[in-house]
């Protein structure tokens, strides 16, 4: 009988231990404080995690990290890149990778478990990171663009420069294992593969002092490629590279040149081979598209009559487009953007609308940074204008004095065939609560949405 109770007690002890293990777990897995980042250029990325427990005063006393070159190896607990073994340490933030030397474009898979005052945790869920291109000599191709303005542009104080559209078609002839694209688009860019927009980021890349640093973004685009012909499309906006004020206080406002791009798409095949589709002189460019002007101070002008249906898909006729130019290399060092991107984080409906003369004033109910997305109504050639302000004057008009010479006006010119179409600017943002609407037929609150923009932190 005593042996029976002894065995029962032992089983109960192990059961309680397992319950404890299940109640103390690893969460918030981060690499360089980012969630599964694609494209980092830290040679020894720093790893972080948190311990979550239902018990109080549970403290870490050690950790064990595994980093593998494939998910399969990680699932087998094979840390072929780094097996830290048990490390006696309370550290769970900014723990530097200390394994084999990492290479450009390498994918790394990792997990961690902790030893605590309450026992050993289970392994964390798996995470990963992808290395960027670790130096500029790892990039193929050249910087491309067009170092001139066009006849419809204006380089006066209130500069107007249309967006540049670039495209290239290429063939993928074998089954793809994985594909990663690295892009530096100055001043701002939107990226498309086979007509699909890549990523949720807006106003990318993060602005820098371009004399010192140029940032690039990286994306896993494996699922967007087909084993056949493919197309890459890139739209370049001005951002703060081609500055908002030309030939105006040059001692204060630096201008860095016309928009330009460098891009590497690295395709790795199932048979172990790889190839890089790079920005080179085989690309085509036009600036005669719908974004006629984009200026952070003055707003964006979009002429839908200039839309180029299917320009970022295979088979588009680009015979009228220009060959790109090889343009000068920016002076700043090309680095991975290891910071959360800007994105639309909230959407709000205006709380009121009232008419003043032939105009309408929208009240968003709060100050916000971002833009208005609106439903399109109108005949071909109709012009809809949105002007932005943070305050109203006593007579209900916008208060604009604090904006000095900024025009803060987004303009949409109708194509006339829009049905259930919405539009928002791509390459500008505004700080505002009130919006003056001109040229919009019978506006209602539900015709407009405020898209609030912030970083992903």
Where are these regions (language model features)?
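Bacterial Sec-dependent N-terminal signal peptides
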Residues: 1-25
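Extracellular/oxidizing-compartment recognition motifs
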Residues: 24-107, 111-457
